[in-house]
């Protein structure tokens, strides 16, 4: 069988690596006009199959974009020569529903082969996760390329832990030109979804090495968490991140005001005087939260590494280079 068609296709993709594009709305209006509709359709299917999955997919944008920009490096599986980001400290046993992105990519490849990047899928799917659960809808800028590699170490070095305090989070977000308001609004992504007992055991039983629970926890809520996450129990048990875990709303901020934040990194936003004003604002004004969240997601989506990229056929692996085709044929 002739290798020429394969070589032509892969050489075409190699030109993509070096050309790059400016992000813009409706990027696929000519090359794949139904791209955004296809992504939303697949997200609806995922939501029907498992409601929690859309919250899981929404988190991909944060965990991807903070590590060397929005390039779908998060989606790459480990290889013998590369430790990717899926097993980094902030992602292992935490991020899930990668199969939803697989399904979206498969649908897009059928409609528009080798056209829509996995990095753009992450951005569109995150937006749709919010909109489909009652939150804001916004126009996304597209035209990203997929990374050629990933780094577990880079993820470990950048991503915050559930123990992070507000001061650390402020400094982290400032590194990416995201304001305090952006940071607090984007933390509202925890309006939907669940977290593991593993992430809060120290809050319940040994906050700051005291051997005591976090004093910021409202007593009745602490008792609820004690029952959910007993000392010595299964740390993979999950609990709701706010009182309305399947609805994107401002209940998350109301819970923080009342001392019912699930994660330390959430509750610290209310105990810190710099971030408290935004928590109170969003708890009282859902429309303002929605506006700030959408603006923050757009800013987050603008983070780019400037590294070479491609349009992956499979979001879990980089494309074979022409030399790879020759070696295995």
Curated annotation (Swiss-Prot):
Task: Briefly describe its induction.
Answer: Early induced by infection with an incompatible bacterial plant pathogen.
For this UniProt entry, what's an example GO CC term? vacuole
Site (Transition state stabilizer): which residue positions?
Answer: 59
Q: What are the GO MF terms of this UniProt record?
A: heme binding; lactoperoxidase activity; metal ion binding; peroxidase activity
Q: Where is the signal peptide?
A: 1-19
Q: Where does Ca(2+) 1 bind?
A: 64, 67, 69, 71, 73
Write out the residues that bind Ca(2+) 2: 191, 242, 244, 249
GO BP term (any one): lignin biosynthetic process
Instruction: Write down the required cofactor(s).
Output: heme b; Ca(2+)
Write down the EC number: 1.11.1.7
- List, alphabetically, the InterPro entries matched: Haem_peroxidase, Haem_peroxidase_sf, Peroxidase_pln, Peroxidases_heam-ligand_BS, Secretory_peroxidase
The record's active-site residues are: 63
**Residues bearing carbohydrate:** 165, 177, 206, 236
Q: Which UniProt keywords apply?
A: Calcium, Disulfide bond, Glycoprotein, Heme, Hydrogen peroxide, Iron, Metal-binding, Oxidoreductase, Peroxidase, Secreted, Signal, Vacuole
Q: Where does heme b bind?
A: 190
Q: Where does the record place it? A: Secreted; Vacuole
Q: Please list the residues that bind substrate.
A: 160
**Chief location of this protein within or outside the cell:** secreted
The entry's free-text remark on the cofactor is: Binds 1 heme b (iron(II)-protoporphyrin IX) group per subunit. Binds 2 calcium ions per subunit.
- Its domain of life reads Eukaryota
Keyword Glycoprotein included in the entry's annotation = yes
Any other comment in the entry? There are 73 peroxidase genes in A.thaliana.
Please report which protein family the annotation says this sequence is part of. Answer: Belongs to the peroxidase family. Classical plant (class III) peroxidase subfamily.
Q: What name is this protein filed under? A: Peroxidase 17
Write down the species.
Arabidopsis thaliana
Per the UniProt record, the lineage of the source organism begins with: Eukaryota, Viridiplantae, Streptophyta, Embryophyta, Tracheophyta
- Name the gene that codes for it: PER17
């Amino acid at each position: 069988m002739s290798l020429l068609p394969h070589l032509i296709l892969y050489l075409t993709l190699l030109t993509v690596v070096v050309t790059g594009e400016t992000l813009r709305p409706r990027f696929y209006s000519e090359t794949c006009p139904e791209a955004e509709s296809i992504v939303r359709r697949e997200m609806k299917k995922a939501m029907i199959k498992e409601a929690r999955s859309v919250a899981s997919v929404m988190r991909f944008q944060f965990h991807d974009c903070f590590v060397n920009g929005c390039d779908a490096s998060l989606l790459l599986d480990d290889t013998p020569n590369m430790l990717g980001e899926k097993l980094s400290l902030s992602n292992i046993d935490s991020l899930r529903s990668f199969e939803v992105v697989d399904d979206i990519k498969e649908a897009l490849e059928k409609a528009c082969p080798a056209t829509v990047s996995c990095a753009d899928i992450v951005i569109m799917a995150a937006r749709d996760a919010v909109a489909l659960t009652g939150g804001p809808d916004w126009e996304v800028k597209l035209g990203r390329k997929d990374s050629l590699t990933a780094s577990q170490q880079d993820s470990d070095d950048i991503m915050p832990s559930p123990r992070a305090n507000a001061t650390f989070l402020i400094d982290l977000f400032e590194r990416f030109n995201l304001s305090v308001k952006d940071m607090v609004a984007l933390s509202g992504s925890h309006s939907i979804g669940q977290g593991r007992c593993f992430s809060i055991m120290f809050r319940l039983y040994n906050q700051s090495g005291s051997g005591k629970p976090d004093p910021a926890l409202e007593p009745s809520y602490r008792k609820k968490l004690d029952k959910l996450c007993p000392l010595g129990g299964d740390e993979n048990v999950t609990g709701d991140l706010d009182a309305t875990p399947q609805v994107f709303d401002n209940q998350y901020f109301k819970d923080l005001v009342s001392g019912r934040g699930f994660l330390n990194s959430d509750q610290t936003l209310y105990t810190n005087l710099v971030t408290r004003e935004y928590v109170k604002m969003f708890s009282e004004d859902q429309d303002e939260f929605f506006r700030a969240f959408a603006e923050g997601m757009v800013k987050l989506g603008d983070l780019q590494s400037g590294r070479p990229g491609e349009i992956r056929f499979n979001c879990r692996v980089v494309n074979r280079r022409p030399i790879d085709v020759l070696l295995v044929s």
